[in-house]
Curated annotation (Swiss-Prot):
It comes from the Bacteria. The gene is eno. Its EC number is 4.2.1.11. SMART domains: Enolase_C, Enolase_N. GO terms for molecular function: magnesium ion binding; phosphopyruvate hydratase activity. This is Enolase.
Length: 436
């Protein structure tokens, strides 16, 4: 029987050493599912609310024992006896039980933990791979990895305001090839940085965190690493950034401390456009602040036909907010983070809405991750085509990459790597590098 028989939760630690929630769901058949919930560093103000204990005597107030109690108490009472195959009904009932718009009463981390664990238990009950259980027999697209190899902003203690500099191996034939290309470039970059006297310590997501003179210098180092690894910048490996602009948006200005700049929305759009002109940059995430909707419209009008503009903090995986963005012509892509909305069902609804509006979708990790690889299966399940799950070190990031290798192997000839499709969407010609 696929009836839920037991629900258990515990407090575990994430990749930053902070507590998070892990949930186990057991069915009457004996099948079970386990899931751990991630946590972000730069978060959107409209995200579903994770519950923390606020007890300064434990984990600096970041404990999650209250969320664990909510799983084992009210949420367990809600879902025990329900059919694990009825994911939508289970998720909706948990939302109703919480009764708040942002899941703040029981905690989004508690609700999501149960939602993910139920999904895994159901797939195990049916003996199906998780990606196939969620997406069906047409789930066969392996995502292009957006690999974060230089960290800044809230993810690293350095002078870079832009949070993530990423490489995108468009020219690979398979996901396995893409992973190899990324790893080779990552290790080459490490050697180049070290040779120039930079520290090669890594940030929260496994990218290097050097102090550099400017954002342009970061781009130049990455392009040099791509070339010295034997690849062509642009056609084989393109670039992407996550500006996380909400983090440096103050009093209506974009304050780039590392470059001593204070920019208006229009100036920030021009600043980002300069990168597009100088480098093979095909994707910008959160180029403007979540509250700067007029600026986002300008950004989309100026660059939306040329590159991918990904909304993270502005949309927070929320279908209602995404609908506003679609209506107003804001962005052309959405980042998908399970814990921003708090259930599997709502996440899938958001992805479907994005696809109907011809927005691209990027399934994403958080900076505080665990060894849980759910998002790897999710990216294939929905044929997202892109995944953001960090750099080429730290096992919390590699757990997702390694799961995608297994999925590609399992799909055999049916597997389709999304790189050529993405290249056709956004890559036209190789811009000339900045020679200064």
């Amino acid at each position: 029987m696929s009836t839920i028989a037991a629900v258990w939760a515990r407090e575990i630690l994430d990749s930053r050493g902070n507590p998070t929630v892990e949930v186990e769901v057991t069915l009457e058949s004996g099948a079970s599912g386990r899931a751990a919930v991630p946590s972000g560093a730069s978060t959107g103000s409209r995200e579903a609310l994770e519950m923390r204990d606020q007890d300064a005597s434990r984990y600096a107030g970041k404990g999650v024992t209250k969320a664990v109690e909510n799983v084992q108490g009210e949420l367990a009472d809600t879902v025990i006896g329900m059919d694990a195959l009825q994911q939508v009904a289970i998720d909706n009932l948990m939302i109703d039980t919480d009764g708040t718009e942002n899941k703040s009463r029981l905690g989004a981390n508690a609700i999501l933990g149960v939602s993910l664990a139920v999904c895994r238990a159901a797939s195990n009950f049916l003996g199906l791979p998780l990606y196939q259980y969620i997406g069906g027999i047409n789930s066969k697209v392996l995502p292009v990895p957006m690999m974060n190899i230089i960290n800044g902003g809230a993810h690293a203690p350095n002078n870079l305001d832009i949070q993530e500099f990423m490489i995108i191996p468009l020219g690979a034939r398979t996901f396995a090839d893409a992973l190899r290309m990324g790893a080779e470039t990552f290790h080459t970059l490490k050697k180049i940085l070290a040779a120039d006297g930079h520290m090669t310590a890594v940030g929260d997501e496994g990218g290097f965190a050097p102090n550099l003179k400017s954002h342009d210098e970061a781009f130049k180092y990455i392009i040099k690493a791509i070339e010295e690894s034997g690849y062509r910048p642009g056609s084989e490996i393109s670039l992407a950034i996550d500006a996380a602009a909400s983090e440096f948006y103050k009093n209506g200005k974009y304050v780039l401390t590392g470059e001593n700049l204070s920019l208006s929305s229009t100036e920030m759009v021009d600043y980002l456009g300069g990168f597009v002109e100088r480098y093979p940059l095909i994707s910008i995430e959160d180029g403007l602040a979540e509250s700067d909707w007029p600026g986002w419209k300008t950004l989309t009008l100026n660059l939306g036909e040329r590159i991918q503009l990904v909304g993270d903090d502005i949309f927070v995986t929320n279908p209602d907010i995404l609908a506003e963005g679609i209506d107003q012509g804001v962005a052309n892509s959405i980042l998908i983070k399970l814990n921003q909305i708090g259930t599997v069902t709502e996440t899938l609804d958001t992805i479907e809405m994005a696809k109907q509006a011809a927005y691209t979708t990027v399934v994403s990790h958080r900076s505080g991750e665990t060894e849980d690889s759910f998002i790897a299966d999710l990216s294939v399940a929905v044929n997202a085509g892109q995944i953001k799950t960090g750099s080429l070190c730290r096992s919390d990031r590699l757990a997702k990459y390694n799961q995608l290798l297994r999925i590609e192997e399992e799909l055999e000839d049916m597997a389709i790597y999304y790189g050529p499709v993405m290249a056709g969407q956004w890559y036209e010609e190789e811009p000339e590098g900045d020679e200064e």
